[in-house]
From Swiss-Prot:
This is Cyanate hydratase. Pfam families: Cyanate_lyase (PF02560), CYNS_N (PF21291). It is an enzyme of class 4 (lyase). Belongs to the cyanase family.
């Protein structure tokens, strides 16, 4: 298992993935089928935020017509965090920052794929957090972010 220390190779692969996805007119769901992984995980991996298991890397590479080097890179542990900027210092807020660093591009891609060009409102918005028992012991936080979709309007 390899780990990346520079973001450039994975960013170049992400660019190739997005180009192939568009050229072949595939959705992330199409690409994910048969991987045995969640749609969000595979999408995050294709956007450079996770490593894929070998079988999944080979399957998505075949769908996207990527080469052996790309298959190897899809399996490498990425240098995570795709959103530059200042880092919060409060530990709880930092964890949300970390979540957005890892899944922000995935959320953006899936929102645009499912809704079109636009945003999820943080004004017309509902947030819910629930504490639930974790079957493995302890507790889990279930956080629901419920925002109205607002399409971009040409002017």
């Amino acid at each position: 298992m390899q780990s990346q220390c520079q973001p450039a190779p994975r960013q170049a692969l992400t660019d190739a993935v997005i180009a192939a996805k568009a050229r072949k007119r595939l959705s992330f769901e199409d690409i994910n089928q048969g991987t045995g992984l969640s749609l969000a995980y595979t999408t995050a991996a294709l956007l450079g935020q996770h490593a894929l298991p070998e079988a999944a890397a080979r399957l998505v590479a075949e769908r996207l017509e990527l080469d052996e080097d790309a298959i190897a890179l899809l399996q490498a542990i990425p240098l995570r965090g795709s959103i530059p900027g200042g880092v919060p210092t409060d530990p709880t807020i930092y964890r949300f920052y970390e979540m957005v660093q890892i899944y922000g591009t995935t959320l953006k891609a899936l929102v645009h794929e499912q809704f079109g060009d636009g945003i999820i409102s943080a004004i017309n918005f509902k947030l819910d957090i629930r504490k639930v028992e974790d079957p493995d012991g302890g507790h889990r936080a279930v956080i629901t972010l419920d925002g109205k979709y607002l399409p971009t309007k040409p002017f």
